[in-house]
Amino acid sequence: MTVRQRLLSYFFNRLRMNYPQILSPVLNFLHCPTPQAWIVQARDPQNLPLLLTDHLICELKAAQTALLLVRKYVADKSGADALLSWLQPYEAFAFRQGPEPDFVALHKQISKSAMPQTDDPWGRQLIDRMVLLIKEELHHFWQVREVMQARNIPYVKITASRYAKGMLKAVRTHEPLTLIDKLICGAYIEARSCERFAALAPWLDEDLQTFYLSLLRSEARHYQDYLALAQQISAEDISARVRYFGEVEADLILSPDREFRFHSGVPAAG
């Protein structure tokens, strides 16, 4: 066994020991587990290119969501423009058939960028947590892209799932309730991603297992960050609203879905 293989084995074993305690709050938060029928479809090797492609796009969309929250609610113009510049090369590649950039170089550039500024304490928390989330999601984006390249899986544009749109349909339309609801939706999307990584990992080869389990800690923290921000900005307890979106999310996961995606529902027959 090479040094690299020993390190991977050690890392993987540590992850396997730690991930149940990371996952437990996520499972308690979600209203249902991933249906077995989805896992059966997801573990089919023929579906791996589609699964990885949708996972890639989900990472970018998670970064976009965080960016939009910062831009709309707290960022000064220069800070907002800086954040926009972070995502533009990724968006051009993923959505507009632009050239594939050097994602490693882009990530290093992002790490050195100036942060948006605000004097509002809650706004400062939003910036700090969302900027970290953006960096992590973009890092995951190019990690998934590396996995695809290593397996000779080309990037092909695909349609979006119904999942996020289904969640956002339930968002109230006046502030600050809109913001609160969007933050709660963000929490559920991150929590479901975490749960699906864990549900799928045992059925994948060791490299993909290690990769997916390595994402659990950050995804679990992201859902908690979203929830904390929602409660902090709300003048009232948000528990009822959290339960409501839990029911919306569970219905999307448990109902038949004709399109297989990373966050799709029960595979529909026919």
Curated annotation (Swiss-Prot):
Its cofactor is Fe cation. Contains a nonheme dinuclear iron cluster. Contains three different forms of the dinuclear site: an hydroxo-bridged FeIII-OH-FeIII center, an oxo-bridged FeIII-O-FeIII center and an hydroxo-bridged FeII-OH-FeIII mixed-valent center. Disruption phenotype: Disruption mutant shows normal growth characteristics after being shifted from anaerobic to aerobic conditions. Mutant shows slower growth on citrate and acetate, and is unable to grow on the citric acid cycle intermediates succinate, fumarate and malate. It catalyses: 2-methylsulfanyl-N(6)-dimethylallyladenosine(37) in tRNA + AH2 + O2 = N(6)-[(2E)-4-hydroxy-3-methylbut-2-en-1-yl]-2-(methylsulfanyl)adenosine(37) in tRNA + A + H2O. Fe cation 2 binds at E137, E190, E219, H222. The keyword Metal-binding applies. The keyword Protein transport does not apply. InterPro entries: Ferritin-like, Ferritin-like_SF, tRNA-Hydrxlase_MiaE. Keywords: Iron, Metal-binding, Monooxygenase, Oxidoreductase, tRNA processing. Its EC number is 1.14.99.69. GO terms for molecular function: metal ion binding; monooxygenase activity; tRNA 2-(methylsulfanyl)-N(6)-isopentenyladenosine(37) hydroxylase activity. Fe cation 1 binds at E59, E137, H140. CDD domains: MiaE. Pathway: tRNA modification; 2-methylthio-N-6-(cis-hydroxy)isopentenyl adenosine-tRNA biosynthesis. One of its GO terms (biological process) is tRNA modification. Pfam families: MiaE. Belongs to the MiaE family. Monomer. Binding of tRNA to MiaE induces a protein conformational change that influences the electronic structure of the diiron site. Involved in specific tRNA modification. Catalyzes the oxygen-dependent hydroxylation of 2-methylthio-N-6-isopentenyl adenosine (ms2i6A) to produce 2-methylthio-N-6-(cis-hydroxy)isopentenyl adenosine (ms2io6A) at position 37 in tRNAs. Can also use N6-(dimethylallyl)adenosine (i6A) as substrate, with lower efficiency. The presence of the hydroxyl group on the tRNA may regulate the ability of S.typhimurium to grow on the citric acid cycle (CAC) intermediates succinate, fumarate and malate. This is tRNA 2-(methylsulfanyl)-N(6)-isopentenyladenosine(37) hydroxylase. It comes from Salmonella typhimurium (strain LT2 / SGSC1412 / ATCC 700720).
